[in-house]
């Protein structure tokens, strides 16, 4: 089983080797039996979608306030990753994410944040930090499509903590291997803007794919629980 480490070495090298990316395979479920015109019963197959994996909301939302770029609103999905969502809300409400950077930006793939070491003036330390504890994996069949939010890990089972990534371009090679816990419902254009910033692709001043010279800062993450100021509800 392949994992995205907290600090990915290189763009997609050693992570999603092109020859190893699997095509998206839809899940097929038996929807039920229908009576045909001739009176015979025929089985009808229904493709299971991402929407079938979650219950109807409202869900809690996390709003990432990105300095100079705007807000990213994430719908959290506790029914597919309850412990991951609970941990993310806890860290956000404690102010853990305030001042943390998006330290990895790979256009067409993902943007990654959540490392407290990204506040350190020495960028060589960036990529391996966390909250000081680890949480269990909560893998599901929810696909890693554009805007999906998933938990990063250290390359081992049950090694996530605080680092997360937002999918920029559909990445089926990650499906079932990382804990999806949310999806962007507003501000995907901010995600797009982050992928357009200048990055240190050669690692001259720290890890590769780190925004440089202008960092992408999360000023705050605010949690809006169900029925509390969530747009559209």
What annotation goes with each model-predicted range?
Residues 20-34:
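Bacterial N-terminal signal peptides
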């Amino acid at each position: 089983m392949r994992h995205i480490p907290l600090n990915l070495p290189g763009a997609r090298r050693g992570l999603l080797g092109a020859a190893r990316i699997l095509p998206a395979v839809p899940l097929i479920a038996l929807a039920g039996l229908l009576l045909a015109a001739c009176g015979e019963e025929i089985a009808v197959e229904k493709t299971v979608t991402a929407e079938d994996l979650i219950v109807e909301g409202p869900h809690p939302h996390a709003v990432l306030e990105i300095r100079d770029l705007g807000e990213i609103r994430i719908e959290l999905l506790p029914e597919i990753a309850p412990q991951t969502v609970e941990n993310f809300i806890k860290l956000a409400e404690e102010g853990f994410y305030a001042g943390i950077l998006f330290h990895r930006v790979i256009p067409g793939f993902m943007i990654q944040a959540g490392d407290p070491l990204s506040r350190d003036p020495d960028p060589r330390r960036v990529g391996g930090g966390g909250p000081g504890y680890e949480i269990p994996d909560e893998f599901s069949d929810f696909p890693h499509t554009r805007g999906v939010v998933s938990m990063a890990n250290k390359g081992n089972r049950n090694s996530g903590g605080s680092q997360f990534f937002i999918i920029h371009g559909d990445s089926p090679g990650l499906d079932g291997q990382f804990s999806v816990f949310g999806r962007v419902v507003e501000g995907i254009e901010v995600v797009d803007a982050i992928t357009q910033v200048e990055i240190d692709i050669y690692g001259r001043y720290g890890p590769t794919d780190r925004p440089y010279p202008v960092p992408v800062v999360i000023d705050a993450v605010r949690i809006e629980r169900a029925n509390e100021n969530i747009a559209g509800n």
